[in-house]
């Protein structure tokens, strides 16, 4: 189907670079098809420090995680914890820790506070933090390094939580 080819990014694992960087382009050229614009090579996903293996039985079931935590939690964990171009380690303990610390506590607390503040009259938070503007600029410089982007987003969330703590609107009403 010519509507989906050429690929902008050809995503492959590091274990099959030779085939997809040498042979696949040759096949495409011989078929007079355009080459992908770039090749994105990701590392391996390990589990508790070990390479995933059916024999060892340490395969991750994404549906099990989605049923327990939701798809967005799994996406967030993978983007935050697994470096884009390097090997990354999956740990159920770390997933649970991130779910509770980042999503339930830090982000959940911020959303709750902002929702409550939004329901009050005459509460205005003037947040002019230079670091947040710098973090936005950094996002553009880290394309495809999702773990770095997420780290910068969390700096913004923490800065906003800190501003709300310092402003202490619950003491002013």
Q: What is each of the regions a protein language model found here?
A:
Residues 1-14:
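Active-site cores that bind ATP or allylic diphosphates and position pyrophosphate for catalysis
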Residues 135-147, 154:
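Long, non-coiled-coil amphipathic alpha-helical linker/lever segments
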Residues 2-4, 28-37:
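Secondary-structure transition/capping motifs at alpha-helix termini
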Residues 13-16, 65-66, 95-106, 145-152, ...:
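Secondary-structure capping and boundary motifs in well-ordered enzyme cores
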Residues 43-128:
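Catalytic adenosine-cofactor/nucleotide-binding cores of aminoacyl-tRNA synthetases and other
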């Amino acid at each position: 189907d010519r509507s989906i080819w050429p690929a902008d990014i050809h995503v492959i694992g590091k274990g099959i670079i030779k085939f997809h960087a040498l042979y696949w382009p040759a096949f495409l050229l011989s078929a007079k098809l355009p080459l992908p614009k770039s090749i994105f090579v990701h590392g391996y996903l390990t589990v508790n420090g070990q390479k995933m293996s059916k024999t060892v039985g340490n395969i991750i079931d994404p549906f099990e995680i989605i049923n327990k935590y939701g798809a967005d939690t799994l996406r967030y964990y993978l983007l935050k914890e697994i470096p884009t171009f390097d090997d990354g380690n999956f740990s159920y303990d770390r997933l649970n820790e991130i779910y509770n610390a980042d999503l339930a506590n830090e982000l959940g607390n911020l959303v709750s506070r902002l929702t409550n503040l939004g329901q009050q009259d005459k509460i205005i938070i003037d947040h002019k933090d230079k670091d947040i503007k710098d973090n936005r600029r950094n996002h553009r410089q880290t394309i495809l390094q999702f773990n770095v982007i997420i780290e910068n987003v969390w700096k913004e969330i923490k800065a906003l939580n800190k501003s709300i703590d310092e402003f202490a609107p619950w003491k002013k009403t």
